[in-house]
A protein has these predicted regions:
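Alpha/beta-hydrolase superfamily serine-hydrolase fold, recognizing
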Residues: 1-279
Length: 279
């Protein structure tokens, strides 16, 4: 429902580049104009296929980067929040998954009652007068947008948490659904959430996966990720979990380089490096 490809942690990207990696940061279609599976998931799976089919290398060469080659044996997926879920979605129901996945506090375990439970700390931010005829204008957006300048917790592209702009139907719609425990029914209406839940879709042979999650997360509680890791272990998938003390949701956008949080979350990227470094 929210976000765009510019809303990333620049220090994290710089860390990836320093490791000699090529970083691709896509936009995708936003719910609810299209559902989760047929919009964001499909778009990211198409991107993965494009990389494997030589599209990325061809694009780089067209940009004058003829000396750059793409090692398709070392493709990895990384994302935060909804992007963490999308990274995980590349591990199943695709012809060729990535080598490894790094999930930062991604949305998972959709059968848990949390996903239909109202969130008072979000509801208290909603102003009066958000009538359906206003917030439902989000369904009139044509074409389906791929860009929203605010994140799940109201963070702007700078990483500052200024809060949503409720004069915009999309912001009002998204935060109303979050506040009332209706995110999944709004973004995957009339469908079985088990179709898209990584907890339900993990199978033997799933890519090696690292999960990084803030212990104080109120938007996607850490116990949801713990269940994912439990299932990964049960299926024999190589995995690791990094629990970051004192951090709430979307902490990656505001952390300071060199802080305890910075050093802890880097273990996720170290995990990726270990996996792709194997012969």
């Amino acid at each position: 429902m929210l976000g765009n490809s510019r809303m990333i942690s620049t220090p994290q990207i710089e860390d990836c580049l320093s490791r000699g990696w090529i970083v691709v940061v896509p936009n995708h279609r936003l719910c609810p104009g299209v559902n989760i599976l047929e919009g964001p998931v499909e778009d990211c799976r198409d991107l993965l296929a494009w990389v494997y089919d030589g599209g990325l290398e061809g694009f780089l060469h067209d940009q004058g980067e003829e000396s750059v080659s793409v090692d398709t044996e070392k493709v990895m997926a990384f994302g935060t929040s909804s992007g963490g879920f999308l990274a995980l979605s590349l591990g199943y129901d695709v012809p060729r998954p990535p080598k490894a996945i790094l999930d930062f506090y991604g949305a998972v375990h959709f059968t848990h009652p949390f996903w239909t439970t109202p969130l008072p700390h979000v509801a208290e931010k909603l102003p009066p007068g958000l009538f359906p005829e206003f917030i439902d204008r989000v369904y009139e957006e044509d074409p389906v947008p791929t860009d929203s300048s605010i994140s799940l917790e109201g963070q702007m592209e700078s990483g500052r948490a200024k809060g949503p702009d409720f004069s915009r139907p999309r912001d009002a719609f998204a935060f109303t659904q979050i506040a009332n425990g209706r995110v999944l029914s709004a973004c995957f209406p009339g469908r079985d959430v088990r179709e898209i839940d990584p907890v339900c879709c993990v199978r033997e042979g799933f890519p090696a996966t690292c999960v990084v999650h803030g212990v104080e997360d109120r938007m996607v509680p850490i116990y949801l990720s713990r269940e994912l890791v439990r299932v990964l272990e049960e299926k024999g998938v190589e995995c690791e979990m990094v629990e970051v003390p004192g951090e709430d949701h979307t902490f990656a956008m505001g952390m300071e380089v060199g802080s305890r949080t910075w050093e802890m979350q880097r273990r996720g990227f170290d995990f990726l490096e270990r996996i792709i470094g194997r012969e």
